Amino acid sequence: QLNTEFAKSETRIIFWFDDKGEYEDEVSELQLGDVKLHILDGTNWLYSKYLLNEEDKESKYLVYAAFAKPSDAENPLADMYYYSTPYYTDRVSQMSQEIGIDNCFKEHLSQYANFWKNKHRIEKFKELGIDHYNAQTIDIGLIAVLTDVKTPNFEEVVKQMMLGDNEKYFKALDDNGLTDKFWELCEKFFGYKSYKPNIDDLSACMILTYASSTLKATVPEAMRTYILKKRNDVVVFIRNIMDNVNYQDAYDKLVERIDKSLRFVTRIQDGLKKDVEKKKDSSLQMSDIFACDAFAGLDDIIIDWALEQLNDEILDAQIDGLNIAQIADQRMSKAYHYSERYKNEYTTIKYAYLMMKSVSLMEFSSDIKTLVANYQKESYLIDSYYRWFYYAYDQIEDNSKFSDVRQRVENIYANTYLQKITPKWNENFTNEVMNATDLPKQEDFYKHYLRGYDGKQRVIVIISDAFRYECAKELFSRLELDEKCTPKMECMLSCLPSVTSVGMASLLPHNEMQVDGNLNVTVDGQACASMEQRDKILKSYNDNNVALSFDEVANANQARIRELIQGKNIVYIYHNQVDARGDKPASENEVFNACAEAIEEIHKLVKKLTGYVSAPKFFITADHGFLYKRDRLQEFDKVTYPKDKCLYTNKRFLITEDAVNEQGIMARTMAYLNKLYVDTPVGADIFKVAGGGQNYVHGGTSLQEMMVPVIELTKNTRGCLLYTSPSPRDA
C-alpha cells in the first residue's frame, strides 16, 4: 500500500501515526525503494520540520510515529500533515488481510492483539495452513502456535499440554488471553469441565476414562467422578498416544504419576483382597483387569494372579476362557501397551504353565518305540519349555516373586519328568532293543546320510557340539518358514558314552571305530580329535572333502567362502557354542543363552551359505545332547560307584572292564569299546565324582543326551555337479 501511494507523482510525504506502536519494531525493515524513513520520537519536532522543509526538499519520506497523532495545537508539523498523505492501518486488519481471514472476524481477532505483535508467531500461524477460518479454528491455531504444535489440531495441543512443559505453555496462553478458551475447547472435545481446571486433573480424567472403558464395574467407587462423558472420544485420544512410540515414555511417566497420586491400582488390589476375605468370586474383576492396559500395575495384578495359580498347581485356571499360557500370550501382544515391559515376566509364566501342564498330562510308556515316537512328536517340548522358562526368568531384573514358581518348575522337571522318563528309557534300553528302535545309529551317519553324495552334489554338514534335539526342533521350525529351502528332521541314537570325542568320531566316514579306557578314539586306526585330523580322514575318502571351523566360515566374506568351498564335495563345518559354555562350571548356567545363540548362529550361516555358494543339500546334526538342571544335587542324592573298577569316571558315566552290577546303575557294552563297559545312572542323576560342573552334564543314557538331531535341508534350486570344470557360478 505504501509503495503504491509513493508511486504517485504528487505524493512526497506520508505521515503514519501508529496509535499502539504495533509496527515500531518492523517499520525499519520495510522495503520502500528510494523513499526515506524518518522516525518521530516526540522530541525531534523542530528538526523534523527543518529536515523536510529545508535540508531535503526533494526526497520522498515516510514519517513514522509510534504514538497517536497529537492535536493540531500540540503538533508542530500540523501544517505539513495536511498537505501530505496520511496512512492508517492496524496489525489485526493487516494480518487478517494477509492471511486471508474474513474481515467479519476482526473483532474476534482483536481480542488477541498481543499475539499479533510478534512477527515470528504470525509466521507460525500462517504455516499451520488452516483450510477454513472460523472462531474455533482461529482459536485452535493461536493455541497451537503458543504450545509449539505444528498442526491446527486441538488433540495435538492437549497431548503437548499433558506430556510437555505445560507450565511454560500456560504462561504463554495467559499472556495472550487464551487460557479460558483452552478449557472451553477441552469441554467441547472431551467433556472436561471443572470449577478449577488444571492439566493434572484433566490428565487424570482422561486416563481414568480410558481405563473405565474396559474396567467397567471394577473402577473403584471413589474414582468414578473422574470419568468424562465423551468416553469414546477420550478412548481414541488416549489410544493414539499409547500407540505412538514418540509419546510412550512420556505417557508412562504421566500414568505412573497419576497412579501414585490417586492410588488407583492400589484401590483395585484392596478390592480384590476384600473379595478373597469374603470368599467372593473375583472372576469378573479379573476379566475387566485382563482387558485393560491403562496402568502398568494392572499387569502386576495379572502376573501375581498367574503365579498364585501356578504355585497352587491350579492348571485349569482361566480368565475369559483363556488358560494361563494364552493369557500371557495375549498380554504380550502389541495390542497391549506394556507388552514389551513385561515380556520376560509373561514368557516365564507361559512356559512354567506349559511345562507343568505337559508333565501333568504325560503318560510314561515302558515301550521304547513309544517313548522315542512320543519324544520326537511332543515330549521334547517339555525340555524346550524348561529352557525357555529359564531363558526368560534369568532376564527379569527382579525375579524374587517368581522364586516359588521357579522352585516348583524345577521340582516337576527334575523329580517328576526326568526321574520318571529316564528310568523308563534305561530299564528297557537293551542292546537288542536299541537295534529295534528303527532309528539310525550315530556311527552310521556318513553311510546312512552322505554316502550317496560321494563324488556328486556338494553337501554341507554343520555339526554343533551338544546341539540337542529340542534345540534343533526350534531351528527346524525357523527353517520351515524359509521358502528357499525344504527341511526335514529325523534323529539318530548317539554312541555311548554320549560325549564329544565319541560323538564327533562317529560322524566321520569310517569302517571301524575304537574307544579305549581313557576315552581316546580312533577311526580306521587314525586319531580324530583335532580339526586337522578330521580333515585328513575326510580327504582319505575323497580329496575334495574338507573340514572347516564354524568361525572361519561365519566370519568370511563371499570371496573367501567361495575359496574355501569351491570344488568341494562334502564339507564338514564344526560349531561349538553350547558345549563351550556348558562344560565350564563358571558358565554352565549360561547354557540356555548358548542354545539361543547357537540356533541363531546356525540359521544365519545357512542363510549366508545358501546365498553365497551352490549347495543343494545341508545336514545339521550334533555329537550328543545334554541334561541341564538348575538346582544342584545334594551330595547324598548322588550315585555312588566302585572306584576300584573304573578306568574312566565322569559325572554321567563310567568306563569299566567289568559291568557294574549295582542298584541304580546300568552297564552296556558296544562293539567299538573293545569289551569295555559304559556304566550310567538309571535315572537323570550324576555319579559322586569330584570337580567340574554338575548342572550341565552329558555322557549318559537319557533321551536328552542320546536323541541326536539330523536336519536335512534341501535348497529349492537345481544343484550343480562337481569336479567337471568347476566355475565361479558353481561356487
PLM regions with names:
Residues 437-445, 449-493:
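Segments forming glycine/polar-rich beta-alpha architectures that bind adenosine-containing cofactors
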Residues 31-32, 77-84, 475-482, 586-592, ...:
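Short secondary-structure boundary/capping segments
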